[in-house]
Amino acid sequence: MRKLLLLLFSALFVLSAQAEDVLRLMTYNVRNANGMDGICNYQRVANVINNTRPDIVAIQELDSMTARSNRTDVLKELAERTQLHPCFAPAIDYDGGKYGIGILSKETP
């Protein structure tokens, strides 16, 4: 968690030094890619991110390699579909894998 916050604030500091640039920051509770219709759809989540075009996305409620997600690394899946770099921070062990938060960013963490 500290590592993610340090990465986020470091990116904010570096990018804020360039006054002409704009930093697009997004936060997104993805509910493990389950929509309000109860359907798990990684592409739908990726489309929301891609349409927003953020520099950094802070993502909550991510599964990593759980039975519930069919052993999918959800953040990695989203990273591939958005062409952003992932950084995952597990909060708890859950359902045979991990559950936590993550960051997707244009720059390599």
PLM feature spans:
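Sec-dependent N-terminal signal peptides
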Residues: 4-15
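Short amphipathic alpha-helical surface micro-motifs
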Residues: 7, 84-86
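N-terminal, active-site-proximal structural segment of metallo-dependent hydrolase catalytic domains
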Residues: 15-81, 88, 92-101
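Residue-level detector of structured alpha->beta connecting loops
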Residues: 53, 83, 106-108
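A well-ordered secondary-structure block
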Residues: 99-109
